[in-house]
């Protein structure tokens, strides 16, 4: 970096501090995560780098997700993993030097929302956009409560439907 060898290919790299911090916490080297550590936390710029380097669609998506990191990611790591995927959440937390939050994902599997639109219709709501809205509200509450069991999800759905009627 000091000799400018990356400048022709990756002028976005201005510091190796992020890479040094990542190396200190990673168990095994990950090339995509290491590249992300060298880039600014800017999804648009990461997308431009991925295009210039002709990365695969999957790698581009991962790099762009990692570049979207922000301090708020550590507030609810499991909600982050549910929203963007476990790998994306791990990338963001490791790149943000948020090891304590990263530890919360160790051994955790992203759950599947146990409710469908049919469960909302069964509660007396006519099929249509309102069902989707109520299902999304139920899912948001489920995530906010830390992914409670199916019995609590049923209660959440009842509460959401009751509030809408």
Where do the language-model regions lie?
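Conserved, hydrophobic alpha-helical core segments of structured domains
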Residues: 1-100, 165
